[in-house]
Structure formats: C-alpha cells, structure tokens
A protein has these predicted regions:
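Extended, compositionally simple hydrophobic/Ser/Thr-rich segments
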Residues: 84-87, 91-104, 148-269
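Beta-strand-connecting loop/turn residues
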Residues: 14-16, 110, 131-133, 177, ...
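Cys/His-rich metal-coordination motifs, chiefly Zn-binding "fingers/knuckles"
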Residues: 1-33, 41
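Short acidic/polar N-terminal linker immediately downstream of export determinants
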Residues: 2-5, 38-48, 59-122, 132-153, ...
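Intrinsically disordered, low-complexity peptide-like regions
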Residues: 4-10, 22, 78, 219, ...
Length: 269
C-alpha cells in the first residue's frame, strides 16, 4: 500500500492525488517501480561489465603471448646485454617461442648461447625434452628486452619449430633425411642448405623462405595468410588455405589444394 510522501496519508493503489493534502501521487508509484526495476537490473549489469572486462584482458594477454610473449606491462630490460652459454647437448630438434631472434648453425659440436639484458636473462627457460632443445620465457613472465637472441650450434637437425613471432635462420645443413618445420604466430624461418624431403606447416601469417634450401620432395601446409618459397624438382604436395601463397622454384610434379583465396605460383631463381 503506497503512502503520500508529503503528509504520510495512506493511499489507494489507483489514487492519483492524496485525498488529504492534494499532492499528486501517480509519479511516486511510477518512481518506486522504476527504482525497483533498476535495483533488479543492477547485479546483472555489473556482472556483464565484469565479464566483458575479463574477456578483454584475457584477449590482450593471449595476443601478447602469441605475438612475442610480451605483455603491455612488466619489467624493462636494463640495456646491459650479456651472453650466457647453456650446457645442453645431444639434441636434433629445436623449439623456440616468445619472439626470439634465432640462428641455427651446423657445427661439429653443440653450443647454445642466449643473449639478453642482464636483469632479464634468468627469466629465459632453456631445457631439453627427449631430443628437443626448448627455448622460451618462463610461464607468466613478461618483459621488454633490448635484445632477445639465441645462437644454436648443432651437427644435425631434423625438426625446427618457431612460435610467437620468433624470427630465425638456419644454414650449413646438408641432410640426407627429411626435415620438419612448424611455424606459427607470425614466425619466420630463412634456411640455406639441402635435404631429401621437406615437411612444413605454417599458420598465423608465418613465412617460410626456403628458396636457397634445395629438396627433392615437399609437403607444405600454409594457412592463415602465411607465405612460403621452396626449391625442388620432385613431388610437391601442398594444402593452401586462408589467403596463403606459395612460390616454388624448379619443375616439380604438383598436387595442390587451394581454398580461401590462396594461390601458388612458379618463380625464378
């Protein structure tokens, strides 16, 4: 039962004016209903805002780690660059993420050199899993480095995987076996040498530059706007999607599946 806000007189539900003092009361009822509606909506509105904010934050964190491993907050490198050698041997595969610049060089022995700011280098994780050398930032670590570089010496290589905007080169390898390459998150690999067969997968705008790396046969999968150049004269099996493009040098037998605006073309030396 409503009451007049002016004199406190009890009112009928349908009353538009207070019979005692004549004060309009219709607006009071409407205001009460509006306030009740606002109170019922407030928890949902607040919850919606919180959910949107969390989604945006997660998106920023994901993109930052995907393209380089750096968040828009975190520590800043001192500018004092040091190089540390990691005591790891007996690996034939390399996995590097978090936006490193990488050189992979053929050599008679193993060496792993990491270069970064002196106040950040301890947050770089270098380990071995099976026959694979793994280099990345430690989990949940973010910083802006003056330099983030890895130089890897190894006698033989059978797999290279770059992610998170890692850019690198490999040279000196004359391989009689197949080489597997996996690039994601805008990574890039330039390679000089040769192998019997190349199996390559590139996604997320990555680039494979193998114009100076000769192979007999190749299986290439490009997606998400990735690009590649390869050199061969044997069989080329290619699956291209999402606006990707593949250049080839030589006269291979082609078996190509294009979709999503992708393309393939022959190029000169």
């Amino acid at each position: 039962m409503p009451f007049c806000r002016n004199c406190g007189n009890e009112l009928d539900e349908e009353a538009q004016f207070c019979p005692k003092c004549g004060t309009p009361v219709k607006n009071q009822v409407m205001e009460k209903q509006v306030r009740a509606r606002q109170r019922s909506m407030s928890p949902w509105l607040i919850a919606g805002i919180v959910i949107v904010a969390v989604i945006v934050l997660i998106g920023i964190i994901f993109i930052a780690f995907l393209f380089g491993g750096f968040l828009p907050f975190g520590r800043v490198g001192s500018g004092n660059i040091i190089t540390r050698e990691e005591p790891i041997n007996d690996f034939s595969a390399v996995e590097v993420g978090s936006g490193f610049n990488v050189q992979v060089l053929q050599a008679s022995s193993y060496r792993v050199l990491i270069t970064a700011d002196d106040n950040l280098i301890d947050d770089i994780q270098v380990s071995k899993s099976g026959n694979t050398l793994q280099i990345s930032l430690r989990p949940f670590v973010s910083f802006t480095a003056s330099s983030l570089k890895a130089v890897i010496y190894m006698p033989n290589v059978d797999r290279i995987q770059f992610s998170g905007g890692t850019i690198g080169s490999a040279s000196g390898f004359q391989l009689s076996h197949e080489l597997r390459v996996e690039l994601s998150g805008g990574s890039r690999l330039d390679m000089i040498g040769e192998a019997n067969k190349l199996i390559a997968s590139c996604s997320g705008g990555s680039r494979l530059n193998f114009g100076d790396f000769k192979v007999n046969d190749a299986e290439v999968n490009l997606s998400g706007g990735s690009q590649g150049t390869i050199r061969l004269d044997g069989n080329l099996n290619a699956d291209l999607s999402g606006g990707s493009h593949l250049n080839y040098i030589g006269n291979p037998t082609l078996n190509v599946n294009n979709s999503g605006g992708s393309s393939i073309s022959k190029t000169s030396n």
